[in-house]
């Protein structure tokens, strides 16, 4: 067995089933130990990630600084001893090291990463897992942990994170605590329509017996973290202050979740290679006489891209956005990651939900300080809403936002129970004030989700996403297919600019920026069809036999109205009936030829 295979096998055998946040893909400014500033970009996800400078040179961020990377003959990435600088400021030594990152070595690195990525991302049912209750006010233990070599930056972390997790309103304690739109509890209160208001008991801070590197590993490209040991050590340090059984919310003898907020930054948002990547892991660990099913973790701090102080230096002491916590906490409730986890599925557009879901890139909306609330599918899975099914032609349906007392609608595939379209109203106010677009948003669901399983990966099959958006403008650009802000590629072949990406999101709802007032088969909008298996067992599509027409949005009230049409043979004008008006439509079509 060669060395690469041995390393891969070791990682996969020791890794716990874990589900994590996407990599933060905006530019990150690092302060180097020599006083210089370096802008970097993070790529990939927990199982395979890398960091680059503006010209694509690979670097490794560590506790001691960010260094030019080396790639060895086994495709492993490691820091050199040479500190990295902006391309125009590089020394001759840096230039030589950058030149050694040849295309064959980069290809080997990504091939190695794809092997680990593929193994780590196979869907799995986590037998015996107990998810948090979806209603009421379950109690959750949150432990604040410092490392032997890193303390908290926030002066009073108990005060700050108790507010961050539980408060109705937020105020600034000098670490931008008020920068978050809502506390975590308030986020779920709003998302659930008042049906779910978790209570977080914050204890600590305690100092772990080992260093950051001991728990976070040292790999610059793969998952080598020890969240199980992190959680065990944290619980043992507070066991005299708490009764673990208080956090068994359904009385089955198992604590559903213990959450750790650790000092410093997280690797998912540009933290050093030794730091933890935000995640929830199924551990099924017995501590004392009580089992804990899941450990979760995220970082204390976040450094927003592009935001600088009055001296021009990046802010480095922002409290973390609630988006990361809400994403990981949602895993502990059973929701899966909805972003694509394979190289093939990242190379295509119209594959996912991007900013339209907390389980995709919506966790980083406004840098994570204004995460996307639960959408119609997520609410229905949690049992917070039962969408009203449309079965016959209905005119003048009024759609209001869920947070304002509205409801969503459902169109079901009579041939396949798990396939539906969901319809809701998104308005740029309240919890959705930071949304990219507004109007009627349509989701295509082809996923047997009557029971939750955080071990699924619904959007990993390129060309057949299971949970996605039907984009009014005909294009939902994948974030993996966008160029970075400096114009360079993310590594998946895409050429969309950041401006095009934002415009694509704004154009997803109806009528949207494109003024699209109908959704019919004739428009050939991606994802507006049903899936079936052809005679060869391959995916094929067929028309839905329904249409949404006369979609209008009242710009003052935000109400959306539309007609639901069950199509009939001869109903050429799609008004829900066959009559002489269809003859006029036919004549118009002929004359237009």
What are these model-derived regions, one by one?
Residues 15-17:
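N-terminal signal peptide c-region/cleavage motif recognized by signal peptidases
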């Amino acid at each position: 067995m060669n060395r690469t295979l041995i390393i891969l096998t070791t990682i996969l055998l020791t890794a716990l089933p874990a589900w994590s946040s996407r990599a933060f893909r905006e530019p990150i400014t690092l302060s180097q130990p020599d006083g210089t500033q370096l802008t970097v970009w993070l790529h990939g996800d927990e199982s395979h990630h890398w960091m680059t400078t503006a010209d694509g040179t690979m670097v490794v961020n560590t506790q001691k600084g960010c260094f030019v990377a080396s790639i060895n003959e086994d495709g492993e990435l490691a820091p050199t001893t040479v500190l990295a600088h902006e391309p125009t400021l590089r020394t001759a030594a840096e230039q030589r090291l950058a030149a050694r990152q040849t295309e064959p070595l980069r290809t080997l690195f990504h091939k190695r990463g794809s092997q680990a990525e593929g193994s780590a991302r196979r869907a799995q049912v986590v037998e015996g897992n107990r998810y948090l209750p979806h209603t009421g006010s379950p109690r959750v233990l949150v432990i604040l942990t410092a490392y032997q070599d890193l303390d908290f930056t926030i002066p009073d972390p108990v005060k700050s994170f108790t507010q961050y997790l539980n408060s109705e309103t937020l105020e600034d304690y000098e670490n931008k605590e008020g920068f978050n739109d809502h506390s975590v509890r308030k986020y779920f209160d709003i998302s659930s329509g008042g049906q779910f208001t978790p209570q977080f008991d914050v204890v600590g801070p305690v100092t772990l017996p080992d260093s950051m590197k001991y728990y976070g590993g040292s790999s610059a490209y793969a998952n080598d973290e020890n969240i199980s040991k992190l959680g065990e050590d944290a619980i043992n340090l507070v066991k005299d202050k708490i009764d673990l059984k208080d956090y068994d919310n359904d009385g089955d003898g198992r604590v559903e979740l213990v959450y750790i907020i650790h000092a410093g930054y997280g690797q998912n948002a540009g933290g050093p290679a030794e730091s933890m990547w935000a995640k929830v892991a199924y551990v099924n660990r017995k501590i004392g006489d009580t089992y804990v099913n899941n450990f979760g973790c995220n970082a204390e701090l976040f450094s927003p891209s592009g935001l600088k102080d009055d001296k021009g230096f990046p802010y480095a002491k922002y409290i973390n956005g609630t988006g990361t916590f809400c994403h990981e906490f949602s895993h502990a409730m059973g929701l899966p990651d909805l972003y694509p986890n394979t190289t093939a599925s990242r190379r295509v557009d119209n594959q996912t939900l991007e900013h339209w879901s907390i389980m995709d890139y919506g966790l980083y909306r406004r840098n994570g300080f204004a995460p996307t609330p639960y959408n119609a599918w997520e609410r229905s899975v949690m049992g917070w809403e039962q969408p009203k099914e449309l079965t016959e032609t209905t005119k003048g349906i009024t759609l209001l936002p869920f947070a304002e007392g509205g409801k969503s609608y459902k169109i079901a595939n009579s041939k396949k129970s798990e396939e539906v379209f969901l319809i809701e109203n998104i308005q740029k106010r309240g919890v959705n004030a930071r949304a990219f677009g507004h109007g009627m948003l349509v989701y295509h669901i082809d996923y047997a989700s009557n029971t939750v399983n955080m071990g699924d990966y619904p959007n990993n099959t390129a060309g057949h996403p299971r949970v996605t958006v039907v984009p009014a403008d005909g294009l939902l650009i994948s974030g993996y297919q966008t160029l970075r802000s400096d114009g360079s590629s993310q590594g998946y072949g895409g050429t969309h600019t950041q401006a095009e990406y934002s415009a694509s999101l704004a154009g997803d709802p109806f009528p949207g920026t494109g003024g699209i007032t109908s959704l019919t088969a004739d428009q050939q909008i991606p994802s507006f069809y049903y899936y079936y298996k052809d005679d060869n067992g391959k995916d094929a599509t067929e028309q839905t036999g329904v249409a949404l027409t006369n979609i209008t949005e009242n710009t003052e009230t935000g109400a959306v109205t539309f007609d639901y049409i069950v199509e009939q043979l001869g109903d050429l004008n799609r008004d829900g009936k066959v009559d002489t008006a269809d003859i006029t439509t036919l004549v118009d079509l002929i004359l237009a030829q």
